[in-house]
Curated annotation (Swiss-Prot):
Pfam families: Pterin_4a. This is Putative pterin-4-alpha-carbinolamine dehydratase. It comes from Xanthomonas campestris pv. campestris (strain ATCC 33913 / DSM 3586 / NCPPB 528 / LMG 568 / P 25). One of its GO terms (molecular function) is 4-alpha-hydroxytetrahydrobiopterin dehydratase activity. Its EC number is 4.2.1.96. The gene is phhB.
């Protein structure tokens, strides 16, 4: 699906059941497309920490990220701190990672790279 367009331009699709859980080969293809993100929890999730100058910028990023989550109907786990946000994606309905996690990771990284919160 997302091989033809960049991940940040793709949109999430409903995914339920283990048929949509990504295997090691597909994870190895997708992970390089989201620089800065790391596999976590034995390949069951991806995480990235985003750092900011202050709490205002941190929360501005969280609010912008919330819009992405709402629009894609795919919601991360967040750890919000004064100067950083830890973002974790996993698809509970498939029991691990799905393409939706990588689509949203790319969109969130693009948001950060564009400096929306500066």
């Amino acid at each position: 699906m997302t091989d033809l367009i960049p991940l940040e331009q793709a949109h999430c699709l409903p995914r339920k059941g283990s048929d949509h859980k990504l295997g090691e080969a597909r994870l190895a293809e997708l992970l390089p497309q989201v620089p800065g993100w790391e596999l976590a929890e034995a390949g069951m999730a991806i995480t990235r920490t985003f750092r900011f100058a202050d709490y205002y910028r941190t929360l501005a990023f969280v609010n912008a990220l919330a819009w992405i989550a709402h629009r894609e109907d795919h919601h991360p786990d967040l750890g919000v701190h004064y100067d950083r946000v830890v973002v974790r994606y996993s698809t509970h309905d498939v029991g691990g990672l799905s393409e939706n996690d990588f689509i949203c990771a790319a969109k969130v990284a693009q948001l950060f790279d564009q400096g929306i919160t500066a």
